[in-house]
Amino acid sequence: MTDDSQRNFRSVYYEKVGFRGVEEKKSLEILLKDDRLDIEKLCTFSQRFPLPSMYRALVWKALLGILPPHHDTHSQVMAYRKDQYHDILHALTVVRFISDATPQAEVYLRMYQLESGKLPRSPSFPLEPEDEVFLAIAKAMEEMVEDSVDCYWISRCFVKQLNNKYRDALPQLPKAFEQYLNLEDSRLLSHLKTCSAVSKLPYDLWFQRCFAGCLPESSLQRVWDKVVSGSCKILVFVAVEILLTFKIKVMALNSAEKITKFLENIPQDSSDAIVSKAIDLWHKHCGTPVHSA
């Protein structure tokens, strides 16, 4: 048996016995052992494969710039991040903006506002739309990242990536959604147009909040692997796949309001399948990055 055929046999075997991704995990571990992390290779890996949960926070921190590439500086940098976290926390406590009763995601929001120079004069002021986005993302991140210091920094840098790197791309996603839905199921798109629903779909939930509060975190983190590593376009294919999955239900609804309400509260039990199919769709239309571990 040649090396290639042995590798293929192992991959098929691993998949059949429930160990899909064993070789991918080994490849990632090799990448993470480098003295200097190769950010480009980590991006490529994250685009191509789901990250093992035990390495997700580390990879996200590297890709979001929270950690520098050099391993020997990681503990020093995270000690600095931790000190900064506690300094901001202390400042907010002193001015009585937060207390022990403040929900953790709201604490992260106030920290972010203080760092950004956007802390309102009173905690009772209504939240701005951008604050609601941060809050939704931070709530989802809490379920994915155990350590509170990591959770704050990842939430903060994830949102900054949306606001900076993806600032021009995000407004284009509704149009791309329409384009790809038309390619996958033109009849379904026609139904949405007939109901005048296309402009009223929950685009903010999908493309601003990146499905936080829509999909369970266990499924959502596989989508965010792609967002963190450089592709906000994956969000389009998750939206398309949601429509395809619930086509029968959506086709039976005859008003924009009913369609939107349903899509804002989709059943959770199909989420893993939706995300897997969405990633396949994304690879089908956008290609698969070449893995170069």
Swiss-Prot record:
Gene3D superfamilies: Ypt/Rab-GAP domain of gyp1p, domain 1, Ypt/Rab-GAP domain of gyp1p, domain 2, Ypt/Rab-GAP domain of gyp1p, domain 3. InterPro entries: Rab-GAP-TBC_dom, Rab-GAP_TBC_sf, TBC1D7, TBC1D7_dom2. This is TBC1 domain family member 7. Non-catalytic component of the TSC-TBC complex, a multiprotein complex that acts as a negative regulator of the canonical mTORC1 complex, an evolutionarily conserved central nutrient sensor that stimulates anabolic reactions and macromolecule biosynthesis to promote cellular biomass generation and growth. The TSC-TBC complex acts as a GTPase-activating protein (GAP) for the small GTPase RHEB, a direct activator of the protein kinase activity of mTORC1. Disulfide bonds: none annotated. The gene is Tbc1d7. It comes from the Eukaryota. Keywords: Cytoplasm, Cytoplasmic vesicle, GTPase activation, Lysosome, Membrane. PROSITE patterns: TBC_RABGAP.
